Amino acid sequence: MWAFPELPLPLLVNLFGSLLGFVATVTLIPAFRSHFIAARLCGQDLNKLSRQQIPESQGVICGAVFLIILFCFIPFPFLNCFVEEQCKAFPHHEFVALIGALLAICCMIFLGFADDVLNLPWRHKLLLPTAASLPLLMVYFTNFGNTTIVVPKPFRWILGLHLDLGILYYVYMGLLAVFCTNAINILAGINGLEAGQSLVISASIIVFNLVELEGDYRDDHVFSLYFMIPFFFTTLGLLYHNWYPSQVFVGDTFCYFAGMTFAVVGILGHFSKTMLLFFIPQVFNFLYSLPQLLHAIPCPRHRIPRLNPKTGKLEMSYSKFKTKNLSFLGTFILKVAERLQLVTVHRGESEDGAFTECNNMTLINLLLKIFGPIHERNLTLLLLLLQILSSAVTFSIRYQLVRLFYDV
């Protein structure tokens, strides 16, 4: 029977600091409200009848508290080395990993805040996490440098037991950082969703790390917990203010901060495959959104659901375009998606019948298509329930189905 593992002193200190971080986040966000509005870092909630100005980019406060917690925490994993008799050699590789991870996250918070202020186009959003992930990749190169993977059983007769990916492994890690940072940003637009999904993912990773503390890779999972515990509590403080009806918006800053934090622990904690499994809803949303992201089907600036003022519920939002302007590829994708009941298409729109409209291709709109109009709070709860169920599926795959592919 599994027993709760004994936590080392640094983790207990980390937990205490994280609890203080929760209190600080809950306190600082309303305290800085007027400062953000004065700086015009504010906007209106498009899914509310009220036109009240709501402060944006509050992820920067959450991220700043997170960094302060970990900056103060840096000495604690190495306390033994302050007593000469208890330290044979200073663990430089662990210190470099900790500093490199903090550098990557710090860069991502800065670049995310720059995006919120400057409102950068999407092509630049892909470059930001790529640049911020470079310190992370260099830490991996200097500390580990291992690019060999264990080949799944079905492919071993072709590739053998081990395969050295070389530079492709670094490309994979860079793409993982880009995906994690943008995946949360794409699945967004209703109160509490960005912070809520990040909270569920971080809680799932914490459970996974705790289970694995008794395994062979204890140090890797302790390292992950150093980041995930303060992230969980600072995000919880942010969600307190971002929950329906939201008093603040998290901004791109939080999405980038959350994504890079997940990428850091997944890469340096050596469980990137499991990390991706925790992103099942985000992966589906990305694949479902791909036709619009690649502009095979026209993509409006905002794809969030629209509020029906009479019912107070959210309904699907639509993309409207001239039928003749749709490319052959777009027409083909639209027909296939319609046949699979993944989109609702209205043809012959407007007086001359020259327009077509289809629902915006996001997981949020797909749920509205399946279940009909839903109140915003209930829609967020439904999406978070889906995130929790996907985590349950991930644990089933990680501890049961994995035997079909690997020797465990």
Swiss-Prot record:
Means of activity regulation: Inhibited by natural nucleoside antibiotic tunicamycin, which acts as a structural analog and competitor of UDP-GlcNAc.
Membrane topology per record: Multi-pass membrane protein
Protein origin, superkingdom: Eukaryota
A Gene Ontology BP annotation from the UniProt entry: dolichol-linked oligosaccharide biosynthetic process
Chain ranges on the Cytoplasmic side, renumbered to this chain: 39-58, 119-121, 187-192, 243-250, 294-375
The keyword Transferase is annotated on this UniProt entry: yes
InterPro entries assigned to the protein according to its UniProt record, in alphabetical order: DPAGT1_ins (IPR048439), Glycosyl_transferase_4 (IPR000715), GPT (IPR033895)
One protein family per Pfam: Glycos_transf_4
Disulphide connectivity of cysteines: none
Segments passing through the bilayer: 11-38, 59-78, 92-118, 122-143, 167-186, 193-213, 219-242, 251-269, 272-293, 376-400
UniProt entry keywords in alphabetical sequence: Endoplasmic reticulum, Glycoprotein, Glycosyltransferase, Magnesium, Membrane, Metal-binding, Transferase, Transmembrane, Transmembrane helix
EC number: 2.7.8.15
Primary location: endoplasmic reticulum
Protein task: UDP-N-acetylglucosamine--dolichyl-phosphate N-acetylglucosaminephosphotransferase that operates in the biosynthetic pathway of dolichol-linked oligosaccharides, the glycan precursors employed in protein asparagine (N)-glycosylation. The assembly of dolichol-linked oligosaccharides begins on the cytosolic side of the endoplasmic reticulum membrane and finishes in its lumen. The sequential addition of sugars to dolichol pyrophosphate produces dolichol-linked oligosaccharides containing fourteen sugars, including two GlcNAcs, nine mannoses and three glucoses.
Family assignment from sequence similarity: Belongs to the glycosyltransferase 4 family.
Subunit structure: Homodimer.
Matches recorded under PANTHER family: UDP-N-ACETYLGLUCOSAMINE--DOLICHYL-PHOSPHATE N-ACETYLGLUCOSAMINEPHOSPHOTRANSFERASE
Designated name of the protein: UDP-N-acetylglucosamine--dolichyl-phosphate N-acetylglucosaminephosphotransferase
